[in-house]
Amino acid sequence: MSKNKMNISHVLFRITIGIIVTFCCVPVIGYSQSDEIHGLIQALEDKNVNIRRRAIRELEEAGPSAVEPLIAALKSEKSRARAGAAVALGRIKDPRAVEPLIAALQDRISNVRAGAAEALGEIKDTRAVEPLIAALQDENSDVRSWAAKALGELKDTRAVEPIIAALKDEKAHVRSWAAEALGKIKDSRAVEPLTATLEDKNADVRNSAARALAKIEPATWSGQVK
């Protein structure tokens, strides 16, 4: 067996054992940290979602040393690897990842675009504001909802009007996240549109609007939050 295959197998074994034994890792003897990071990135391609999630957590723990390999993985031929790399970069929160993640908002696979939007919301770098505003128009509703959520985390008032427009999105989960985002930004321009959203046909959207209003105008609305 080649060294590379042994390395990947060893890391996958490490991840699997970690899932079973209270998420504790079996040490990988004889491999450098860069070898482990490479193996974990390979694990992002696995069909097993638990292995992918565990790999993301391991990469998060690796911290800054994993950033450049993860940025490179955003160009992997495997969409699972690209999506996982985006999420892991968001967890690490290193500003080096911002521009590559912005580029990943144009990926042909919606899961990768959604992962990039999620990550940019975690990093909270204002360079992402305009690209995330554009992502509110993405053809995929999950990407739109993650973009709205990310803009709420960034709390930049440039996003207020575009997020208000998202309150009329055809998908309820997008409308709900748009309302939540407006509550985090706390801009008074959102009060009237959010008040109208209290009549939304979807209960989750109505509740999100009520919570947002309670954050923007607590004296008026806090008693009405369910």
Where are these regions (language model features)?
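Buried hydrophobic core positions in alpha-solenoid tandem helical repeats
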Residues: 39-40, 69-71, 100-101, 131-132, ...
